[in-house]
Swiss-Prot record:
Protein's recorded name: Large ribosomal subunit protein uL4
Gene, per the UniProt record: rplD
Region span, Disordered: 46-77
Function statement: One of the primary rRNA binding proteins, this protein initially binds near the 5'-end of the 23S rRNA. It is important during the early stages of 50S assembly. It makes multiple contacts with different domains of the 23S rRNA in the assembled 50S subunit and ribosome. Forms part of the polypeptide exit tunnel.
Pfam family, one: Ribosomal_L4
GO BP field: translation
Lineage: Bacteria, Pseudomonadati, Pseudomonadota, Betaproteobacteria, Burkholderiales
Complex and partners: Part of the 50S ribosomal subunit.
Cellular component annotations (GO), alphabetically ordered: ribonucleoprotein complex; ribosome
Length: 206
């Protein structure tokens, strides 16, 4: 299989051979959905918390007498039926959101995403991506010349200059192959892969 090799202006300069086991796999929507949901679930910090009726600070005094007022009977204002009362089923920090995905499924899902991106024309190859100075404007101008507004770059090597230049760009995400994740691949409109990263992706997902 061949993919476009882009020049500095974002135009297809030539074609490059890439492994079909990674970039020409059958599209598996169910598997992709499963690994994306699992990745997002496993990234949750699990720190959210709500209070039940025992934890809410309210008086235990009966708000009004049992009979004669015409109101529904009430025992205390911490009841979940009352505004400001506790939750019936509160979210707790100790909830476990972990979802297990075995390695074979994850590799197949990632290869399926990369293959679909290639079919849609959202994935292309560049020789390399380097900047001489850690200046955001330099990298922003480079992507502007290539007509890229939302891009994920999978580079075989992310040096300090490239990291510092890219971290303040809102719609740019630069990573090494080992840090590529399904959510980012699906999110960004364009994915650029350096020539040196292709072999690493093959080792990881073929």
């Amino acid at each position: 299989m061949q993919l476009e090799l882009l020049n500095d202006q974002g135009q297809a300069a030539s074609k490059i051979d890439v492994p079909e086991t990674v970039f020409d796999r059958q599209y598996n929507e169910d598997l992709i959905h499963q690994i994306v949901v699992a990745y997002r679930a496993n990234a949750r910090q699990g720190t959210r918390a709500q209070k039940d009726r025992e934890q809410v600070r309210h008086s235990t005094k009966k708000p009004f007498k049992q009979k004669g007022t015409g109101n529904a009977r009430a025992g205390m204002t911490s009841s979940p039926l009352w505004r400001g009362g506790g939750r019936i089923f509160p979210n707790l920090p100790e909830e476990n959101f972990t979802q297990k995905i075995n390695k074979k499924m994850y590799r197949a899902g990632m290869a399926s995403i990369l293959s679909q991106l290639a079919r849609e024309g959202r994935l292309a190859v560049v020789d390399s991506l380097k900047v001489e100075t850690p200046k955001t404007k330099v990298l922003a101008d480079k992507f502007k010349a290539m007509n890229l507004q939302s891009v994920m770059v999978i580079s075989d090597e992310v040096d300090e200059n490239l990291y510092l230049a890219s971290r303040n760009l809102k719609n740019v995400f630069v990573v090494e192959p080992r840090y590529a994740d399904p959510v980012s691949l699906v999110h960004y409109k364009k994915v650029l892969v350096t020539k040196g990263a292709i072999d690493k992706l093959k080792e990881m997902f073929a």
